[in-house]
Amino acid sequence: TTWSAHCRQEGERLGYDMSALGDTARITEPINADIAASTQLLFEETYLATVRSLGKMLAGDGMMTKNLCLSGGTALNCPSNSRVWREGPFENVFIEPTCDDGGLAIGASLHLYHNLLDHPIAASDTPATAYLGGAYGDNELAVALAVDGIASESPDDPAEAAANDLLADKIIGWFEGKSEAGPRALGHRSILADVRSAENWRRVNQVEGREPWRPFAPF
């Protein structure tokens, strides 16, 4: 029995309104929300069991380490990562910012270069950073704003101005330095809102053009 067939059978047995199943206009109704939550929990349990099995295998071979590095699309699942960190056998869990398919390609190339072609890994004192993308100067930003007719000003303290806007329940876009590598916004190209307002969940999703139920990453 497939997972989808199992969910359908259980939904009918438990008396859910099955007419809403898969209907994007009714995506938050119980049958859809509960299947999504159950699928997430199943994924978390499978993910955690895999990590625990890895820990046991390493320990059995005398190779136990305190460190775990996760990559691939599954490592973009933040609730699962949190459980692996809290409940798994590894003390330190690292998820690199480009853990999607693009990052896997980079990792495969580095593995080939260093492990198969035997090129040494050069020592570096440069701190690792996720901010590897493009940076733009004030003139470039002014031109981009002018093209769309957007008025701008330059406050003496941008952080204070942003904090005041957030306190006034405004949604702001934060643009700073180089852009992030990988699919996640990590503070240099981010949309920010006051988390104390439940309404901001809907507002930010509306600004981003996303479905109203989509979650956010706290920062």
Placement of each model-derived feature along the sequence:
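Phosphate/ATP-binding catalytic cores across multiple sugar-kinase/actin-like superfamilies
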Residues: 38-64
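Short acidic-aromatic active-site loops that bind/stabilize oxyanions
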Residues: 25, 29-45
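Active-site metal-binding loops of divalent metal-dependent hydrolases
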Residues: 74
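Flexible beta->alpha loop and helix N-cap segments adjacent to enzyme active/binding sites
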Residues: 1-21, 25-26, 56, 67, ...
